[in-house]
């Protein structure tokens, strides 16, 4: 049986926590930031957690994480 390949795009965007959940960064924070409010940009700094419905999909994409 061959090894399962890790989806490299997902591996760069998601990290697994000790409890087994996935965390990632927020979108909309790379450019065109002048029109966005300071409060919004500050809130985008925090990590985002993946919903349980999508976690199963990530488990298949990241088998060794």
Swiss-Prot record:
GO terms for biological process: translation. GO terms for cellular component: cytosolic large ribosomal subunit. The gene is rpmI. HAMAP family: Ribosomal_bL35. Keywords: Ribonucleoprotein, Ribosomal protein. GO terms for molecular function: structural constituent of ribosome. Belongs to the bacterial ribosomal protein bL35 family. This is Large ribosomal subunit protein bL35. The keyword Ribonucleoprotein applies. Gene3D superfamilies: 4.10.410.60. NCBIfam families: rpmI_bact. InterPro entries: Ribosomal_bL35, Ribosomal_bL35-like, Ribosomal_bL35_CS, Ribosomal_bL35_sf.
